[in-house]
């Protein structure tokens, strides 16, 4: 078995992005573009993956961690110069090296695997991944010989009229015999207008030395798009989003309007779940089977069980069980845990709280820093008053408690098992189990008050 290696070019600053964030760290569907590339390369069975880093090296290393070894390109002097920085890691090894740009997040493991296999079958020393472009302006053109191998790569500015008609372009992804690659790199010069060392010159050197230079055509130009500005970033986002939605639909998820649905690359969704338009599913969210999500809901890093409905609502960094109903217009804030068969209704905010099985907060409530037991009913306008201006305090509501409408529970406080809190109460002390707490002023009716009031106004 021939050993495989990978070099990922991730040193560019990306000035056209006009951003403080380094280019390869810009996210596509929630994942940095270089992470997309590394994740796909990891499926190829490579012995080593070398990430060539430069601008933002520490941030790139922090993102990729132990998935890669690293080579530093201190000065950006061209693509051949970048690959040369990987020499201490690879130059004396036998095998095949694939070179991929870190700003091509749409490339797939399937296409790279096909490139590697074609390289072996063709007996090539170098193989170029090509693509057919509708508009090849600005790309290097692939000129093939009668055997179908690469005769030369002609840059757009150097191409004659006939060559400019060619729509097969160089994508910037290559496969090389590893030893020959690093031998050829020592012969590359910077005798050009930009004074840079170009990897395309390696192709010419290998060909001049008698090596076969082959080409493998990618199934879709979209896979090969390089991200150099925000316009290309948005296009890659659109393509990736469509790809993600299609994969979920193939797996049994109904997405009513994929064009109006955002699902991160790391989300998992069970079959027979329905996603309505305007829904945003971010991070490593897991959604079970037979759920209804949306319309217009935002879910981030949540774990959601089966048969749960979330409509017109926001949920972040929380656990939500089976058969739960959330919304419309509810907000589940981080570190909340909602057990099975719970209802969180309209205009209810839950913050860093737990709800036991079967409990309900159906309307206009704030439940923060609370432990709510099972089968608890929180009436309209229930508030856990958790903040005194300096510290946060917790409220505990035990199983079966009933909290009347417009009740304020001043934390720290415990409402005992099966206890009742009367509507309109402000509760400052613990309530024993099965007791009724009434914390409000007694009603006083003033007879004939309105007549006296109106009489004063007339006079």
From Swiss-Prot:
Q: Which keywords does this chain's UniProt record carry?
A: Acyltransferase, Cell shape, Cell wall biogenesis/degradation, Cytoplasm, Magnesium, Metal-binding, Multifunctional enzyme, Nucleotidyltransferase, Peptidoglycan synthesis, Repeat, Transferase
Query: Which molecular function terms from Gene Ontology are attached?
Result: glucosamine-1-phosphate N-acetyltransferase activity; magnesium ion binding; UDP-N-acetylglucosamine diphosphorylase activity
Can you state which reaction this protein catalyses?
Answer: alpha-D-glucosamine 1-phosphate + acetyl-CoA = N-acetyl-alpha-D-glucosamine 1-phosphate + CoA + H(+); N-acetyl-alpha-D-glucosamine 1-phosphate + UTP + H(+) = UDP-N-acetyl-alpha-D-glucosamine + diphosphate
Listed name of the protein: Bifunctional protein GlmU
The record's section on Pfam families has: Hexapep, NTP_transferase
Residue ranges spanning the membrane: these are none
Instruction: Name the gene behind this protein.
Output: glmU
Q: What is its main location?
A: cytoplasm
Mind telling me which NCBIfam families this protein's record contains?
Answer: glmU, PRK14354.1
Task: Please name the catalytic residues of this protein.
Answer: 363
From which organism does this entry originate?
Geobacillus thermodenitrificans (strain NG80-2)
Tell me which PANTHER family the record gives.
BIFUNCTIONAL PROTEIN GLMU (PTHR43584:SF3), NUCLEOTIDYL TRANSFERASE (PTHR43584)
Q: One of this protein's GO BP terms?
A: cell wall organization
- Region Pyrophosphorylase: what ranges? 1-230
UniProt lists the family membership as follows: In the N-terminal section; belongs to the N-acetylglucosamine-1-phosphate uridyltransferase family.
Cross-referenced CDD domains:
GT2_GlmU_N_bac, LbH_GlmU_C
Role description = Catalyzes the last two sequential reactions in the de novo biosynthetic pathway for UDP-N-acetylglucosamine (UDP-GlcNAc). The C-terminal domain catalyzes the transfer of acetyl group from acetyl coenzyme A to glucosamine-1-phosphate (GlcN-1-P) to produce N-acetylglucosamine-1-phosphate (GlcNAc-1-P), which is converted into UDP-GlcNAc by the transfer of uridine 5-monophosphate (from uridine 5-triphosphate), a reaction catalyzed by the N-terminal domain.
So where does Mg(2+) get bound?
Answer: 103, 228
The residues the record assigns to binding UDP-N-acetyl-alpha-D-glucosamine are 9-12, 23, 73, 78-79, 140, 155, 170, 228, 333, 351, 366, 377
Cofactor mode of binding and number, as noted: Binds 1 Mg(2+) ion per subunit.
């Amino acid at each position: 078995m021939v050993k495989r290696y990978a070099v990922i070019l991730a040193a560019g600053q990306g000035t056209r992005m006009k951003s403080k964030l380094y280019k390869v760290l810009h996210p596509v569907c929630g994942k940095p573009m270089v992470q997309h590339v590394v994740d796909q390369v990891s499926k190829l069975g490579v012995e080593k993956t070398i990430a060539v880093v430069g601008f933002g090296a520490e941030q790139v290393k922090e993102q990729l961690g132990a998935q890669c070894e690293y080579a530093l390109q201190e000065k950006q002097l061209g693509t051949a110069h970048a690959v040369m920085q990987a020499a201490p890691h690879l130059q004396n090894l036998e095998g095949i090296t694939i070179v991929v740009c870190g700003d091509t997040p749409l490339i797939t493991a399937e296409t790279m695997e096909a490139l590697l296999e074609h390289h072996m079958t063709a007996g090539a020393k170098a193989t170029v991944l090509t693509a057919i472009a509708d508009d090849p302006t600005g790309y290097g053109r692939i000129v093939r010989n009668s055997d179908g191998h690469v005769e030369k790569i002609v840059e757009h500015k150097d191409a004659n009229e006939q060559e400019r008609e060619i729509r097969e372009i160089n994508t910037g992804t290559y496969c090389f015999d590893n030893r020959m690659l690093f031998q050829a790199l020592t012969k590359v010069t910077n005798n050009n207008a930009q004074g840079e060392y170009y990897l395309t010159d390696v192709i010419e050197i290998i060909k001049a030395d008698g090596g076969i230079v082959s080409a493998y055509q990618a199934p879709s130009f979209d896979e090969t798009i390089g991200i150099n500005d925000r316009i290309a970033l948005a296009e890659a986002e659109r393509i990736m989003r469509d790809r993600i939605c299609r994969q979920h639909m193939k797996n049994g998820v109904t997405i009513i309007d994929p064009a109006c649905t955002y699902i991160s690359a790391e989300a998992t969704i069970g079959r027979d779940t329905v996603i309505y338009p305007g829904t945003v599913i971010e991070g490593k969210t897991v959604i079970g089977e037979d759920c209804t999500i949306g319309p217009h809901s935002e879910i981030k890093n949540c774990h959601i069980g089966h048969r749960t409905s979330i409509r017109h609502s926001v949920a972040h960094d929380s656990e939500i069980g089976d058969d739960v109903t959330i919304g419309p217009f509810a907000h589940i804030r981080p570190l909340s845990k909602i057990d099975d068969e719970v209802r969180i209704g309209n205009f209810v905010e839950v913050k860093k709280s737990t709800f036991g099985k079967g409990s309900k907060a159906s309307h206009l409530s704030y439940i923060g820093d609370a432990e709510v037991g099972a089968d608890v009913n929180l009436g309209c306008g229930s508030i856990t008053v958790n903040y005194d201006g300096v510290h946060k305090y917790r409220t505990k509501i035990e199983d079966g408690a009933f909290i009347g409408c417009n009740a304020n529970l001043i934390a720290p406080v415990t409402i005992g098992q099966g206890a009742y809190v009367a509507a309109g109460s402000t509760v400052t002390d613990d309530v024993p189990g099965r007791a009724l707490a009434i914390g409000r002023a007694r009603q006083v009716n003033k007879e004939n008050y309105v007549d006296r009031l109106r009489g004063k106004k007339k006079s």
